[in-house]
Amino acid sequence: LSFYDSLIKDFGADEGDFILSYVISHEVGHHVQEVTGIMSQYQEMMGKLSEKDGNALTVRLEPQADYLAGVVARYQKDQGYLDPGDIDEAISAAWSIGDDTLQKRAQGYVRPESFTHGSSEERTRWFKKGYEAGDLSEWDTFSAKNL
């Protein structure tokens, strides 16, 4: 629960119980990346890249986990588990932990070349994309022309 508290107090996310679902679903998304072999391919490539190129690759990994969190949210909606405002809570959480938002808050300026998790806009867009699709049909952030 400490990360939940940080999202609210330190990062400015809207308060709500669905934030926990978003965070857990995002982390489960990383597990899906692990069992599908994406994570091992990512780790192999990271060993061959400069820091800048490694950051650019990592920025492709994180929104994919946000996409998967969106797929889970869609399932929850289809099952009737969501309350009004839940999706807005998840979007607020994703926005609040985008690299640009975090950097601006911490240092007053943004350095896109140092991003490791994607911008607020990218993170929320991929969450929404997963929510709208409701399946894995559009989850390939690595081949996407634009994040």
Regions found by a protein language model. Give the residues of each.
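Active-site scaffold of zinc-dependent metalloenzymes
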Residues: 1-21, 34
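Zinc-dependent metallopeptidase catalytic helix centered on the HExxH motif
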Residues: 9-13, 40-45, 53
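Soluble non-cytosolic domains of exported or imported proteins
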Residues: 12-23, 52-63, 81-85, 117-121, ...
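Active-site recognition of the HExxH zinc-binding catalytic motif
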Residues: 22-35, 66, 70
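Catalytic Zn2+-binding segment of zinc metalloproteases
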Residues: 28-43, 77
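Short linear capping/connector segments at secondary-structure termini
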Residues: 44-51, 108-110
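Short helix/loop segments within enzyme catalytic domains
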Residues: 53-56, 60-102
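Pan-zinc metallopeptidase signature
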Residues: 97-147
